[in-house]
Amino acid sequence: MAESMLGLNRSHRCAEVVNAPLESEVTVMGWVQKNRNKGGIIFCDLRDRSGILQIIFEEDECGSEVFNKAMKLKQEFCIAVTGILKKRSGAFNESLATGELEVRATGLRILSESDTPPFHIEEDSKTKEELRLKYRFLDLRRPDLQRNLMVRSKVATTT
């Protein structure tokens, strides 16, 4: 069931956490890109228009209520996460601006649930154009199309 955003404010976009001090509390919002349950710890890739950020749900740190909610997350759920920004202890992902960082979740709100999308929302989608046009609202979440829209907006506002 979806929850309200009442009283909740985003502190950073996903890619902007690189400017936040380590060990600070951050609140990020976006769509679930991937969710991996490794038994006792859940890894969630959160995506917004700025990029992708890894969120860690560990039952000992976030509590059983938040952990049980995190177990229900699926691709394209819209969520808000509050947690502590930390440097990744394991392998870094050099292809991401936030590849050295993670958020250790202390709170989770599911803002909107989603059915399984008809295609993966990623940079190099091999999906047929006909299907992408049918689900244009999902296709516009892809990073390359978002970049195009931002450039178009900048050009339109400068002329």
Task: Set out the residue ranges of the language-model regions.
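Class II aminoacyl-tRNA synthetase catalytic cores and aaRS-like
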Residues: 1-159
